[in-house]
Each structure stands twice: as C-alpha cells, then as structure tokens.
Amino acid sequence: MKVTINGKEYSFRDGETILELAKRNGIFIPSLCQFEPLGHKPATCRVCLVEIMDKNGKRMAAACETPLSDGMVIDSISRHVRDMQRTQVELIFADHDQDCVSCVRHGDCELQDLGESVGLSRNRFTSKLPQKPQGRTLDETANGMTRDMSKCIRCLRCVEVCRKIQGVAALTLDGKGTDASIGVGMADDHATSACIQCGQCIMVCPTGALAEKDENDIVIDMLSDPEITTVFAFAPSVRVVLGEEFGLAPGVNVEGKIVGALKAIGADIVLDTDFAADAVIMEEGTELLHNIKHGGKLPMFTSCCPGWVNYAEKHFPEILPHVSTTRSPQAVLGALAKSYLTDAMEIDPGRVRVISIMPCVAKKDEAKRPELARNGVPDTDVVITVREFARLLRRFGINLSDVDPEPFDNPFMSSSTGAAVIFGSTGGVMEAAVRTVHAILTGRELDTIEVAPLRGMEDVKEAEIDLGPENGRIKVAICHGLRNAQKLAEDALAGKSPYAFIEVMACPGGCVDGGGTSRIKKKYHPHAKTRQQALYRMDRSMPRRQSHNNPQIRKMYGDYLGEPGSHKAHDLLHTCYSSRKKVPSQTIEK
C-alpha cells in the first residue's frame, strides 16, 4: 500500500495516519494538540491541515486523525496549505493570552515554537480582539499549582493524562467552541476538586495554562532577611534531574553543585533530605514489623508520596488505616530541622525557615497540611520544584554548570546511605525498607542487597522476601501511576491482597519524573530510565547502603529520639490522615 506526499511515494502500514507516516519518514507537518507518547490525537487545534486527493475527491483534512488509503495524494507544503496552517495558528494566538514575557513557559512554549514553524511574523487578528481573552478562569486556590485558562489551547492532554495515567479524572472539558475550557468537574474550585496535585498535567501542557505555584519571591525574602536562618534541603532525585535545566546530560549527579549554588545565593545551612529518607526507613520499617508481629493492618502502604496520600484521602479513604503513619522525608526533615538540629546547634527555632527543593508539585500541598505544623507553624516553610529552583538560580545570574561543588554543611543531618538515594526511583522505598527489615529480623544483611524484581518501569512489580526461619516469607509489591494503585487498594479493602507491604508512587517512574521536574516538549518522561540508573549507580558507590548503618541516624536516635517508634519519634516523625472524599471510588480503564 502506497501514498504520495509532496510528490514522493511512501509505503504505509495498515491503520496509520498521515501524521504518523510523515513523522516516521522525517516529513514535518506542524501540529499542537497531538501527543504521541499517550496516543492522544483529539484533532482540536486543526493546525496539521493538509490537502488530500483520494477516491472522495480533493479536500483539506487534519493529518493527525486522517487514516491513509492506497493511492492517496497528500500535499503538506504548497502555498495554499501553508496559508491555511498559518491562519489556524493565528486564530489560536488570537484566542490566547499573548503576554508571553510574564508566562512561566516563555521561551519553552510549544505554541511559540508553532508560530515560528509556520512562519508567523504578524497576526492579522490580534488587533481586532483583546490581548487577554475575557472571562477565562484563573484559579490559584490549590496549594501547589495554578490554572490559567486564558492560556489554554484546549488540546485536552491534561484531561487525557489525568484519566489514562492517573485514573483520577479530575479534569473535564466544559462548554463548546470558543467558550470551551478545562474545568474541575463539579467542584467550586481547584482546591476543593478531586485533583491530587501530582502535576502530571503540567508535564504535558504545551503552554503555561497549568503551572506550579511559584514561590521564589518568598525564598528571596527569606534569604535577604538577616534575622532568619535559612535551612535548605533537596530530595534524592533532584541531584540527577536539575542539571538538565542547565544543558547537562540527563542523569548527571550535580549534588555538590547544588550545595555550591545554594551557598552562592546566601543559604545559611544546606542539609540532605536523604538523611531524612534513612530516618523514614527506620520508622516505617519498625511500623511494618509491629503490624506483622502483632496483627496490625496489612498490607501496609507507604506514605512518602503526597500525591498518593491525597489520592487515598480523596478517592479511597477506606484505605487510610492501611497507610503508614510515618511522615515523608520532606516532613521528617522539616520537623527535625526545627527541633533536633536547632537544639544541637543552639539556634532559635523561631528564626529558622526550612526551604525544600523537590521534584514534586504535591509536596507544596503537603507542606501546608495542618498535621505537619507545630503550634500553627509549618515544619517546612516553602517548597520549590526543580523548575522553580532553576529559575531562582537564573535570577541570581548563576549557571549551575559553572558552579564549583561543595559538601553539605553540618555533622548532624547530612550523612546518608545508598538506601536513601534510591528513594527517587519507583521501587526504591520498598527496596530500602527490605534491606533494613531483613537485617533487623535476621541479624544479617541481605545476601543480594539489590532487589532486582523491584526495579524497572513495569506498572506493578512484586517480590518475595525471606525473613528467616522464624518469620517466614512475605510478598511485597510496588506500583507507579495512580491508575495502577486502584486495583491494589481495592484488593486490600476486599481482603484479597497477598502482600504485606505495598509502595505507591503517583508519578510514572517515581520522583525522577515528578510533576515538578524538567519538561521535554512533546515528550513524556523520556529520561526516566537514565535518571533511575544514575540513582542506582550512586547507591552502588556509597560506603553504606542500608539506612540502619547511617552513623548520623544512630547518633540521632541515641542522643535525641531514643529508639525507632518511641513516643518522641512518634510525636515528631509520624502523622495522621482524614477522609476528604470527593467522588465515588471508581476503576478507570486504560
């Protein structure tokens, strides 16, 4: 079967569209709404117009949705076709907020790229319409992200990823024609909707319609206040993602450069969230052992991912008794920085501000949970994403590539293990927990410290762990992408789960591809495996690879907390949850 494109003959596959064949053969046809990684082709933007001749005659058609037929003749480059494509782009711009310089996506926008690709030098319609579309929603009610519908081009990618990957279906298409916009279902606003603020919609949005809530000015205010002691910390995955924002290859470890950059902008203390990850394993592992030995709720689910916690509270509150009460590493670090650290360093905790650099949008929401505050004062004051941190450094004129590496600051909360590093990958929390739980129960380390069945990008993975003759074997599971968590939660509630412990990460690939990480236009997590492998290499290079072997963790428990699971540890390092159910539980198919 053959067709002709711009005078040249090509063979095509059964069911293939014009745009798919063109891409496969390196023929450029401008497009916007189509998103190949998700198989998404709603044909709403109509930019990929081509002229076709087939048995039905000559006509214009959208290349993304038009299937090929034998003998079809396609024109994508004539003056007439180019004019039609350009006109369509002009109309999209005319219905779009054109204050580009203030947009978070300025210079990294697919719509701007599209204007260049069709040769748009002047918009005939701009002077005839308001520069900013009227009556469009600007919703800033959510803690982690903003929705500006004046910048929405109705590509429906956000609706697709929310439904197809996350199974949340918080976003809907409301209205018709030019009055159509993306809404939040029956909710009054974003904050009260079914959205779990994972940020995966931001990762696929081609414009600035969806974005993290920028808090860099708050950070700069803290840095400039001489009465404040700023404590910065960053997550495991940040060190293998941030470099991409400054032109470095995916997976390059820039840990030392991050510390150096933070010192350059005036940070007083730089800690490692990896330390807190080791503390999480000590608490979560102790909690799991208690549940196994004393008939507690099984399976126990991890609690590190705030997107998952939001999902559990809003969609499956019945599962909350199964969710570990151990705080996330971010929340653990914030609590310890304003108690253990301030005591050890003789600092007034009232003047300490904790700034957390995360790969995650939902972490912003987590930091504002009232359960993670003491006397109304949040343990973590500000959370900025990888993208925000890159913008912050640029505001200080810093190129990370040029920064000399520096070590973490103090001897109290800066040591970590390989187990903490792999928290950044799906399966990492479970693998770290298995390493420590096995050692506590058997008195010896795992024969093979790397638990291969828990690694990789499969939606759901499981492993069987031998805990010695007295304790037998347990099955554990991990999943990433919340649609995959639905079945595991349903089985647990029905008493059908064969697992003792289940790790859930909201974002595909885990934190290395969180909603606050670097975006690659028209791609969806293309560097997940590269970033994961970088974390695994770091794990292998660490002198200690089990959380219980971290000397600073041992010192903290010996000097301050007592033992894992102690009353003081529970007061500082554990939390609680409550139902915020918005919609009936539902299984959303692929």
Task: Give the residues covered by each predicted segment.
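Extreme N-terminal starter segment of soluble prokaryotic enzymes
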Residues: 1-2
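Conserved SAM-binding loop
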Residues: 11, 154, 301
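Charged, low-complexity surface patches
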Residues: 11, 141, 151, 194, ...
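Iron-sulfur-associated redox domains of electron-transfer enzymes in respiratory
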Residues: 14-77, 81, 93, 213-590
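Fe-S ferredoxin-like electron-transfer domains
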Residues: 46-197, 203, 210-229
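Structural motif corresponding to the C-terminal cap of alpha-helices
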Residues: 166, 205, 341-345
